[in-house]
Amino acid sequence: MNDLVVAYKPAIYNLIEEKSREIGFTMPSDLYVGSLLKTLISSKPKSNILELGTGIGLLLSWMIDGMDSESKLITIDNDPTLISIAQDFFGNDHRVSIVCEDGTKWLRTYKGNKFDLVFADAWPGKYSEIDKVLELIKIGGFYVVDDMSAQENWPDEHQKNVDQLIGYLEGREDIFLTKMNWSTGLVIAVKK
């Protein structure tokens, strides 16, 4: 097996990657994480999905690719420039709601349906508001976090945040947890 070759990238992926280079976006997403998210989402027909941290939309393209016609996805970022780009790429997809708002504020005020999958790629939902996020996940739903392995661009002392998050999740009794030393370092939890 050669997992270095990722087949079946979303049709729009290369255009988003090109836009990423054009604007100098320095936090591109990993193909492996995208492929995994697509696979997990494909297992949840008629799903309700939340992405915290839209970025430029690279992983969003994978997530949308895995959705069926009756699934819904909300993606949130607080950067209006990135949200505008995501809107250009995905704004016509009736299944997708693209929200420009602080993730903490959004999580604290959200009153809608629970989620089948939450992908946390931003501070809110990953290092803050964790209890709220886990409350919003259906039984059998996934909580996915990436960037858990040390990276060159991490600020000093960031490893402490990662260690605290993992320790906290390991101590919870309402989730099954798998830590994966793969790609950017992943944590996948399933709500009991």
Which residues fall in each region the model found?
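A short alpha-helical cap/connector motif
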Residues: 1-117, 124-144, 148-192
